[in-house]
Amino acid sequence: SIYPNALSVSAWGGEDDETPRYGIVKIGIKAASGSTLTETTKQDIVNKLKPYNVASVSPQIVDPETTSVLLTSTVKYNTSTTTKSSDTLKSEIITAITNYNTNTLQKFDSIYRHSKLTGLIDSVDTSILSNITNVKIRKSFTPSLASSQKYNIYFRNAVFNPHTGHNMAAGGILSSTGFKVTGSDLEQFLDDDGSGNVRRYYLASGIRTYSNETQGTINYSNGEITLNSLNVASISNIRGATSTVVELTVTPDSNDIVPVRDQIVELDVANSGITVTADTFVGGSADAGVGYTTTSSY
């Protein structure tokens, strides 16, 4: 084996990238240790591959690019068939989700299959009656501070846009963590207008006020986001910790998430929301379904 520490490998022609590069075969390698490969290790692999090179085609080793899946799950259970508390069931569900993430995902060829995940949740305990689990996906980019730059972020999965102008007033299907731009002390965020435009805004008394309604574009069919001439001065903390990245979160068109080329899909279990509640219908407190509420699937 040329690199025995490889846990997962993906290879494709450079001509298949968003910006085609001919004469190159790209090889994505995820190390078993979980860390990215050093430049020295990458060059060593390239050297070992030289005897296998075809004509003028050269190999290039690239690091995996992570797409995080965020879950919001509402689970209903029958209190009369278990002595377990909702907290205990929640803990067991999180364990099942974590095991799925570790054992099935985090490889180049591993698709997040939504029905498999929801089935695992249902099978955690016989008292569980149903779960409504919604999906968002997240990527990040690292801005060059105090420099006007163009950024391309590739989800490589279609994102939800059932009609032109979808959810325009509420920010479309794109959200971001905060940052400040050069020349302003206002914390800025990104959303979309449902018509392919990425907008930059700040909050004034909780209301979105747009600084730039054409900060970039979003391609709903393939999840490509382009940010034009964005001059980031500083980056806001994320979940209470200092950050060097800006996170972008979108609603996918499909609940199944596919890793493409150098992508690896993983569940962000820590930042997913799991709510376990007693089902009132089977518990006897609902009257022929009157007053029974369901959770939105969207």
Task: Give the residues covered by each predicted segment.
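Surface-exposed interaction regions enriched in Ser/Thr/Asp/Glu
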Residues: 30, 194-198, 206-298
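Structural flexibility/helix-modulation signal
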Residues: 166-213
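Short, glycine-/Ser/Thr-/acidic-enriched flexible segments
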Residues: 16, 31-34, 76-80, 142, ...
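An aromatic-glycine-centered, glycine-rich loop/turn in mixed alpha/beta architecture
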Residues: 84-183
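Carbohydrate-recognition loop of C-type lectin domains
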Residues: 1-108
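Hydrophobic alpha-helix feature that most strongly marks membrane-spanning transmembrane helices
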Residues: 4, 50, 54, 98-102, ...
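Short beta-strands and strand-coil junctions in structured, solvent-facing domains, enriched
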Residues: 34-36, 79-84, 104, 123, ...
